[in-house]
């Protein structure tokens, strides 16, 4: 179900929240479940959307802005004023396809680095929306990839942990001022 938080899709000179980058410990801590969806949670989601749009992103998880809560926002059509963003609270992947796709990913917490990652092509996710209502979504394509990427953030996993080409990963990280020591490879 679409979000109904009133947020203008534009860049702000001073986004409301500060992004955290690869190497920051906050990105590696598992986020805590949200016990009650209220105005304070909706305010966090609104600020996350404003920060995401300001950074030209299509997804953002609360840990990326230093908030240790299971909240994520996604908008795979940020240039379409009619497309509503998705707010997911306490999301859980319930099922996923056996079919895998390899696509390039990037991350607001690792600017400039874009590398191929293998993920399930389809996912079924249960979550609460910004009003606390239980929802289930079946997603494919870019939306499925964005959801999986952001849910990873909620568990302290970053997309670079899933990159199979370690030599290219080290090169790209170094090229953009990051160190490979901040990566925690996940066995394929």
UniProtKB/Swiss-Prot annotation:
Q: Which UniProt keywords apply?
A: Hydrolase, Iron, Metal-binding, Protein biosynthesis
Q: State the SUPFAM superfamilies in the record.
A: Peptide deformylase
Q: Which CDD domains match?
A: Pep_deformylase (cd00487)
Query: What is this enzyme's EC?
Result: 3.5.1.88
Q: Which reaction does it catalyse?
A: N-terminal N-formyl-L-methionyl-[peptide] + H2O = N-terminal L-methionyl-[peptide] + formate
- InterPro entries membership: Peptide_deformylase, Peptide_deformylase_sf
Q: Name one Pfam family in it.
A: Pep_deformylase
Primary enzyme class: hydrolase
What GO terms in the biological process aspect are recorded for it?
co-translational protein modification; translation
**Residues that bind Fe cation:** 107, 149, 153
Q: Recall the GO molecular function terms of this protein's record.
A: metal ion binding; peptide deformylase activity
In this protein, the active site sits at 150
Query: How, per the record, is the cofactor bound?
Result: Binds 1 Fe(2+) ion.
Q: Does the keyword Protein biosynthesis apply?
A: yes
| UniProt keyword Cell wall biogenesis/degradation, yes or no | no
- What cofactor is needed? Fe(2+)
**Function according to Swiss-Prot or TrEMBL:** Removes the formyl group from the N-terminal Met of newly synthesized proteins. Requires at least a dipeptide for an efficient rate of reaction. N-terminal L-methionine is a prerequisite for activity but the enzyme has broad specificity at other positions.
Q: What is this protein called?
A: Peptide deformylase
What's the source species for this entry? Thermosynechococcus vestitus (strain NIES-2133 / IAM M-273 / BP-1)
Lineage runs: Bacteria, Bacillati, Cyanobacteriota, Cyanophyceae, Acaryochloridales
């Amino acid at each position: 179900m679409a979000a109904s938080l009133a947020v203008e899709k534009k860049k702000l000179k001073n986004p409301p929240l500060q992004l955290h980058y690869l190497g920051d410990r906050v990105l590696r801590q598992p986020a805590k479940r949200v016990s009650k969806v209220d105005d304070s949670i909706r305010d966090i989601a609104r600020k996350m959307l404003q920060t995401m749009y300001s950074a030209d992103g299509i997804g953002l998880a609360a840990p990326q802005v230093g908030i240790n809560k299971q909240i994520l926002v996604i908008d795979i059509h940020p240039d379409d004023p009619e497309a509503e963003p998705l707010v997911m609270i306490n999301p859980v992947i319930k099922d996923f396809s056996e079919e895998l796709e390899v696509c390039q990913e990037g991350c607001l917490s690792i600017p400039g680095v874009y590398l191929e990652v293998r993920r399930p092509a389809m996912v079924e996710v249960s979550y609460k929306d910004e009003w606390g209502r239980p929802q289930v979504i079946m997603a494919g394509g870019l939306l499925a990839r964005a959801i999986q990427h952001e849910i990873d953030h909620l568990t302290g996993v970053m997309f670079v942990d899933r990159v199979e080409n370690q030599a290219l990963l080290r090169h790209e990280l170094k090229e953009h001022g990051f160190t490979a020591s901040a990566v925690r490879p996940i066995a394929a």
